Amino acid sequence: MCYSKINNSLRKRFRTFYPVVIDIETAGFNPETDAILEIAIITLKMNEFGLLEKEHLLHFHIQPFKGSRIDKKAIEFHGIDPFSPLRRAISEYEALYSIFNLIHKGIKSNNCTKSIIVAHNAIFDYNFLTAAITRTKIKNNPFHSFVIFDTATLSGLAVGQTVLARACKAIGLTFDNNQAHSALYDTQQTANLFCKIVNRWKTLGGWPPNDTRTIKL
């Protein structure tokens, strides 16, 4: 394999980690007591030019777990009806099983070691995901136990904005506020934002680190 192909692999770019963009919509702010209502993930790939792109998408509506708390303010904020039959919601375990299965395939095909969460204000999604994994007792968690990529932090560095909508617009992406706070839409936009930041850094000469185009400060 030639040097350029090695540097253009996910394994090389992210230190053997397989980045997966995730967004979780919930019925509150406490990951131990408040229900997960919706989850979406997008896996990523490198194209032939070493640019990051979206690959696979999974999106699920989630049944509130037994005894979970539903905060009315959270429901008013995102407009999700937890008990609507039109959502065709599934259990946390079913959703995590499908998500983990897809991620493990991606880890294997890219010769990576672990997956890494990419999310906007990532600690929120990380905490809810971790609580659901503990609650369901599901095995083979593919995610790194503490390393995460937070696009709020990255976009603050890249474009001086930390709010998802503002960061997207600042980097040249459109953002529809009417679709915001849907796990599906927010995951798509977070993935677009992350790819833009990573690819712009490469274009500026920041990757690979010894690229002769690297800008000297």
Curated annotation (Swiss-Prot):
Cofactor(s) annotated in UniProt: Mg(2+)
Coiled coil: none
Residues covered by the Exonuclease domain: 20-194
Disulfide bonds: none
Chain positions of site Important for substrate binding and specificity: F29, F77, F124, F146
Any Pfam family the entry gives: RNase_T
Name the UniProt record assigns to this protein: Ribonuclease T
Species classification: Bacteria, Pseudomonadati, Pseudomonadota, Gammaproteobacteria, Enterobacterales
Gene label: rnt
